[in-house]
């Protein structure tokens, strides 16, 4: 044997490890020529008590395993096509239309800008979700060293449109969310309208004689309203 493929070597090792009873049912014959190597198995069929001859042609290749008759170029191309088809069809079908999912998830008015309110997935009338509405901002409250810290998310408003009032132990925060195109509203042609305008409002009530209203401070940073007020000692 001048050049034996590693696959055939493994098969021969496996045969040599058979017990005597197994060796009576299996025989191997090795043939070699310039181009191909073949391993002939004689497998005994216990039901018919005869032998079936299985001839497995193995292309002669070296350690790199660059070519094999078990996976020719045609089979490789078929696998590539099947893989591409999986990503083009099964993946897309499994997750559905992403744009439709996003449109269905939007909790405000989607206005198609040619004058009608009918996105591709459904018809959404103007009275269903008004453009002007009230928002209750998300609030985070904590206390450090007798100082109450309040954070509210009110993105999209100008700091001059934020009003904070503390009267009779009731803290009221109001912020108006204006349109970004007030001067051009009647002139421009909208391609899509998914933004509502309105008012942020949050009312917090403290226990009587708990906070000192003269110590209240507020600042607006990156869409977050920060309020601090001292408690009575």
UniProtKB/Swiss-Prot annotation:
Pfam families per record: HSP20
Keywords from the named record: Stress response
Stretches assigned to the sHSP domain: 129-233
Gene3D superfamilies associated with the record: 2.60.40.790
Superkingdom in the source lineage: Eukaryota
Induction remark: Up-regulated by phagocytic stimuli.
Record family assignment: Belongs to the small heat shock protein (HSP20) family.
Protein name (record): Small heat shock protein hspF
Organism: Dictyostelium discoideum
């Amino acid at each position: 044997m001048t050049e034996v493929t590693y696959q055939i070597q493994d098969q021969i090792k496996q045969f040599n490890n058979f017990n005597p009873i197994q060796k009576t049912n299996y025989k191997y014959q090795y043939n070699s020529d310039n181009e191909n190597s073949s391993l002939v198995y004689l497998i005994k069929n216990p039901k018919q008590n005869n032998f079936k001859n299985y001839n497995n042609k193995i292309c002669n290749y070296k350690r790199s395993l660059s070519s094999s008759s078990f996976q020719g170029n045609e089979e490789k191309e078929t696998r590539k096509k099947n893989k591409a088809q999986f990503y083009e069809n099964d993946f897309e079908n499994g997750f559905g239309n992403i744009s439709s999912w996003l449109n269905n998830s939007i909790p405000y008015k989607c206005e198609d800008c040619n004058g009608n309110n009918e996105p591709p997935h459904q018809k959404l009338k103007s009275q269903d979700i008004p453009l002007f509405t009230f928002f209750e901002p998300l609030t985070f409250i904590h206390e450090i060293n007798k100082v109450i810290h309040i954070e509210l998310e009110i993105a999209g408003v100008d700091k001059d449109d934020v009003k904070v009032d503390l009267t009779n132990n009731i803290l009221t925060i109001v912020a108006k969310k204006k349109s970004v195109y007030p001067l051009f509203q009647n002139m421009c042609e909208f391609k899509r309208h998914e933004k509502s305008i309105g008012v942020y409002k949050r009312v917090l009530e403290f226990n009587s004689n708990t906070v000192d209203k003269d110590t209240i401070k507020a600042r607006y940073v990156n869409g977050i309203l920060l309020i601090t007020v001292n408690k009575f000692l």
